[in-house]
Amino acid sequence: MGKVLVTTALAYTNGPLHIGHVRSTYLPADVYTRFLKMRGIDAIHIGGTDNHGVPIALQAELEGKDPEEIVEKYHEMIKEDLERLNIHFDEFSCTCREFNPDHVDMTQWFFKRLYEAGYIEEREVEQLYCPECERPLPDRYVEGVCPYCGAEGARGDHCEACGRYLEPVQLEEPRCVICGSKPEVRRTMHLFFKLSEFEEDLKKWLESNDNLPKNVRNYAIQWVREGLKDWDIVRDLDWGVPVPLEGYEDKVFYVWFDAPIGYVTFTKQYCDRVGQDWKDYWFSEDTKIVHFIGKDIIVHHALFWPAMLMGVGATLPYTIVAGEYLTLEGEKMSTSRGWVVWVKDFTKLFPADLLRYYLIVVSPLTRDADFSWGDFRDRVNNELVANLGNFVYRTLSFIYRFLDGNVPEAETDQEIVDKIKETHQRVTEHLEKFRFREALTEVLRLSKFGNEYFQEHEPWKLKDEDPERCAEVLRGCARIVKALAVMLAPFLPDSAEKIWQSLGYEDSVHDVDWEEALEDVETKEIPEPEPIFPKVTEEDLEKAKALLPEESGESEGQDDEYVSLEEFNRLDLRVGKIKEAERVEGSDRLIKLRIDIGDRTVTAVAGLYPTYEPEELVGRKVVVLANIQPKEMFGVRSEAMILAVGDEPALLTIDESKREVEPGERIR
């Protein structure tokens, strides 16, 4: 394998990091890069902060500060938050024009290449202008009523209620957020990136790139099918990267034009520091570029950014890993309401590895997940403390107490050798395919096996009855402990290091090869063992819950007779295709269905018999609610719900007279 360039979405410097940011983007990228490096692969992790655009300019204006002050403050806070969680970067920089002139140069280099190639076009546009403030009103400088859903408070670039991207002139009843007055429409010249010219190339790339996850591919292809529109890449603003074109001296690039170029800027800065050529990463077929992002910016990374790369002849992403949303105690996180867990607050109460563990195992990355303090306590205490920590501590404590603190010289049961090899192979395969939860679960299964092996062979009896066999059992357990330390290193770096040092090793587990997990443990003296993980107590939980307001405020002011658009948008309604159907044993009406919903196949139990025979359901496309609480019925776990009409159910059908609809497409 050649070089691997791992990037994480640039953190926007208008606030510190919360656990949702960590789960979707930074943690999986860190795990993946650590894994690659342990395998001896030439991999680097590039990241930083995104510092331009209207939100920062507006925040600075409202606070009476310079944008640079906002950027500098939150850049340092974000960097510290990432360090608190042991998330390591080979290069961590910023896009701020005042602090990083290299990024200005790189952004303008991209623009000039695209301009010279004919992909940039000048057009006259309408924009809102505030006569009171005597200024244009780009993006969030204006609010109003969404023209699509009627929600009040829609911003000039986006409606939070229905998720639509907007232009300021589309808003109904617009008002300037600075002075509150009604703006007027004026005309000005802007520059457009001709995204439409890349429509066919993007479609081919999306459909042929098997490395792209389904949640990314399906979402991006849906945009392509609806027709790509050319992209306005400048703003009438004084905060951003200047446009190097005559007549545009008072304008800057749109933040989503310059932000992804930050990946290239930071790579060049890394290469300049270590004496490499940045084009070996961005203009080489031997490099795999892996982007880790949140699902809210799929369109930017799967359409806009690849088109820009095509336009300059650069390497396209190998894959784009998009983490889904994280809720908090069943409610959408909200920084404005304080319904959020900040990284800094968490790490004051608990070790970083506890958060890393929970965010990985709570749900696959490609599914929405919920952070619950009660579930966090249960998983830490039952899985880390009672399973993994217990096995390591009881093994090493027994060796320390009864074998003079020396790992015994003995043979290892073949059963253990085989189990370690099998686990190592599965963990490797899962990580190669970005299945982080499944990989870490396999490691925990190995420690569970170790506990069962220890309990079954009763070394506390063998030490007196059969010392030779006792030595074999304990050496086998110590070998499992070593394998656990190595395979945990990408996931739980601090805990893996503790386990490694507990075996008497003086080097770092982060400096050993991934294959070291398969090697025998060394015969050496160990230090007195200490517990690896702290137990989460009720007192700890009370302190943690005190960080949140008593109520999330999610339903404040809502009429119980109505469902808000925000509530409706929490429903994950998709097109599903039934792959298998069979009667549920013991039930008169239930049919068990296996349904393809794009990024995964789910099981649903539905009362469709005798209206429908199982055979006639296979191949049908149906409407699926994909994020309903799972429920067990007649011994079958139902993970989704299909929608139908009436007590004698009539399935809703999908109109495909205009185009074919794919499993996984969202219903909105």
Curated annotation (Swiss-Prot):
Protein name: Methionine--tRNA ligase
Residue ranges of domain tRNA-binding in the record: 567-668
Native organism: Methanopyrus kandleri (strain AV19 / DSM 6324 / JCM 9639 / NBRC 100938)
EC number: 6.1.1.10
Predominant cellular place of this UniProt entry's protein: cytoplasm
Function comment: Is required not only for elongation of protein synthesis but also for the initiation of all mRNA translation through initiator tRNA(fMet) aminoacylation.
Subcellular location: Cytoplasm
Keyword Kinase: no
Cofactors, names only: Zn(2+)
Gene3D superfamilies reported for this sequence: HUPs (3.40.50.620), Isoleucyl-tRNA Synthetase, Domain 1 (1.10.730.10), Methionyl-tRNA synthetase, Zn-domain (2.20.28.20), Nucleic acid-binding proteins (2.40.50.140)
Alphabetically ordered keywords of this record: Aminoacyl-tRNA synthetase, ATP-binding, Cytoplasm, Ligase, Metal-binding, Nucleotide-binding, Protein biosynthesis, RNA-binding, tRNA-binding, Zinc
Homology family: Belongs to the class-I aminoacyl-tRNA synthetase family. MetG type 1 subfamily.
Sites where the protein binds ATP: T335
